[in-house]
Amino acid sequence: MDKLIITGGARLDGEIRISGAKNAALPILAATLLADGPVTVGNLPHLHDITTMIELFGRMGIEPVIDEKLAVEIDPRTIKTLVAPYELVKTMRASILVLGPMVARFGEAEVALPGGCAIGSRPVDLHIRGLEAMGAKIEVEGGYIKAKAPEGGLRGAHFFFDTVSVTGTENIMMAAALAKGRSVLQNAAREPEVVDLANFINAMGGNVQGAGTDTITIDGVERLHSASYRVMPDRIETGTYLVAAAVTGGRVKVKDTDPTILEAVLEKLKEAGADLTTGEDWIELNMHGKRPKAVNLRTAPYPAFPTDMQAQFISLNAIAEGTGAVIETIFENRFMHVYEMHRMGAHIQVEGNTAIVTGVPALKGAPVMATDLRASASLVLSALVAEGDTLIDRIYHIDRGYECIEEKLQMLGAKIRRVPG
C-alpha cells in the first residue's frame, strides 16, 4: 500500500485546476444507460471509483471508448447482461445507481447489495421503495436486489423521501425519466450534483424540472437520445485546496471551478480571516501569512455546510486562534480522523456528534493512518502545517476522491511525496 510523506512548514502559493466532480460523474455515467444511442461524458476525474464504474459497464457487455482528453463514450445498445456483480459493487457503493436506469430502460436489473461503508449506515431501502412506487416488483435475495418493471414499463409516481438521500433522489429521478406519465419527488436532495444529473438527462431529451429544490417533477419521455456532456467541477476538492491555503497562511487560486456551489464553505473561510476573490470559474484565497481564527460550524444537507468538508475544518481549527465547535448531523462515525490528529498534538474533544477543537500554535509530524476519504484529506492538511515529517498510511482512501493530490500540492510548493508500500 502506498504512503504519503509530508514535510510541514511550506506556505502554499500558486494556481491549480480543479477536477470534475466524482459525485456528479458517477450518477451521470449510470444515466448513460437510459439513452438509445452513444453518449459522451467529459471532464471525468481520473479516480478509482470512475474506473470501477467503467469496468462495471465492461462486465455488462458495453465497451466504453476513452479518448485522450479522458472523455468516455458509452453505447448502451450493446448491453448483454443486466447484472451488477458483488465483487464490483462491494468496492463502490455508488454502483447502486445503475438500478433505476436498468429497470427503466431494459425492464429488469440485478444489483448486488452494497457492503458497509466506513461512515455509518447508508440504507438502500429508499431506492427500493421509490421503484416499487413506480410499479417495479423487487425481491432481495442472496445479497442481490432483483427488480422487474411491470408489463408496459415503469409508471410515474408521487414519492416522498422520509430522509433526504442524494443517491436515492438520483436513482428514482433516472428511473422516472423513462417512466409513463409524471413523477413528483418530494423532500428530494438539493445538491448541485443532483442538478448536474438533471441537466444531463435533459440534454438527452428528458423533462426534469425543479432540481435544486426539494420538489422535483419528471415527465417521462418515450426515449432519450445521444448527447455530449461535461461534468461539473468538484466542490469538495475546491474547498479542500482553499483550506490548504488557509492553514498554511498562503495564497492559492483554484481554476475551472464554480464559486456559487460553495457558498457555505467560502463564508466560513472568510470568518477564519481569509481574503477571498472570485470570478465566474475561479476562486483566490489569500491569508497574507496570518494564522486562521477558529470557526463554529454545523453540517447539514445542501445548501448548508457540507459534511464532506467537516474534517478539513477540524484541521483548520486545530491550528487556529481560539476554540471552535464542529457539529456533525449527517453521518455517524465521522470523527475517526480525530484520534489520528491527537497523535500530532491536536487538542480535540469529541462528545457525541460534536468535536470541540482548541487551536494549538503548532502540530507535530507523526505516523498516522487514513480511515476514510475525507478524514484522510484532513490528515494531509494537518501534515502541511506540522513540524517535521508526517507519514500517512492507507492513502488509497485519498485516491478514491482526490485526483493526483501530491502533484497538485507540489505545484503549490508543498513538500510531499508518495512512496510505494
Swiss-Prot record:
Signal peptide: none
Keywords on record: Cell cycle, Cell division, Cell shape, Cell wall biogenesis/degradation, Cytoplasm, Peptidoglycan synthesis, Pyruvate, Transferase
Reaction(s) catalysed by this chain's protein: phosphoenolpyruvate + UDP-N-acetyl-alpha-D-glucosamine = UDP-N-acetyl-3-O-(1-carboxyvinyl)-alpha-D-glucosamine + phosphate
Top-level taxon of the source organism: Bacteria
Keyword match Cell wall biogenesis/degradation: yes
UniProt binding sites for UDP-N-acetyl-alpha-D-glucosamine: 93, 122-126, 308, 330
GO MF term (any one): UDP-N-acetylglucosamine 1-carboxyvinyltransferase activity
Pathway terms, separated by semicolons: Cell wall biogenesis; peptidoglycan biosynthesis
Any one of the GO BP annotations: cell wall organization
EC number: 2.5.1.7
Subcellular location: Cytoplasm
GO CC terms, sorted: cytoplasm
Record PTM 2-(S-cysteinyl)pyruvic acid O-phosphothioketal, positions in chain: 117
Catalytic residues, chain numbering: 117
Keyword Transferase among UniProt keywords: yes
Residue sites binding phosphoenolpyruvate per the record: 22-23
Functional description taken from the UniProt entry: Cell wall formation. Adds enolpyruvyl to UDP-N-acetylglucosamine.
Similarity comment text for this entry: Belongs to the EPSP synthase family. MurA subfamily.
Protein name listed in UniProt: UDP-N-acetylglucosamine 1-carboxyvinyltransferase
